[in-house]
């Protein structure tokens, strides 16, 4: 009798669970859920636009990205400060990570970079896996697939530059499944980044460039060649990298012909040099706010925290290719006789150009 009682209870519980599933609307028609995100062309377009959401800094009014509560979107401070060409200075504790030798694994800058890149990875994986359900025509489907795989390659490329090998996920997973161990840096380049970019480059539905489109600045074959060329540089395959960089020009991209300081403005967002563009305006608080940290005190209250690294500056040569020497500059003939301490206080301004409108604010 007791065994029959347990059997009846188990059957009743199963029926109750099944009834709940039948009654529960797991794909509501009045909102976008994971079950219906990729079910129509309209929703697929929204999903593709959503892949770029992670790049945006939504906290412009909270100040620059120097505290964890303000850090949002693409971390330009981190990538600039950790690069060879930049020295970063700040007496603000959250920024110490960027120029201290010892890095804590739980530091918020490291955590943000990890979370930022893997958010793009997992969103791209979702698109790659589910786009076929949206009923798209073949060219649109292939282009969307290329965009998603390009963004995944971009995110893994950035992760690999920072950590030299990371866990690899190429399919949608739950939080509980994020338990894979680190792959080698070479594995990430050869088995993840390069295959994704090859798919983009070989795909006939992926445009050479997006300069003339309404969605200009989106990924293209030219951008894929550029990113793949950088991957080959990390693999020290120099000639292969050079070949890819040559192809960037064949896709319709070119170098900026004007003054460098004039380049970064909304007017030039369709310039041929813009292969995968980030919106920028020199007035802080709109498209960006990194200029508040990069600019000197005479440019709209800049904080003077990001500076050219001295090692990087020493790589410069004269425009004819000969070695640059400070002692050959008029007025600095005795440069070689100065002590390092005396040189440290010397600052040379040559052709200073400032925005009068911003400087007056």
Model-flagged regions — what are they?
Residues 21-147, 156, 161-162, 166-172, ...:
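Short acidic-aromatic linear motifs embedded in glycine-rich loops, typified by GG[WY][YF]DAGD(H)
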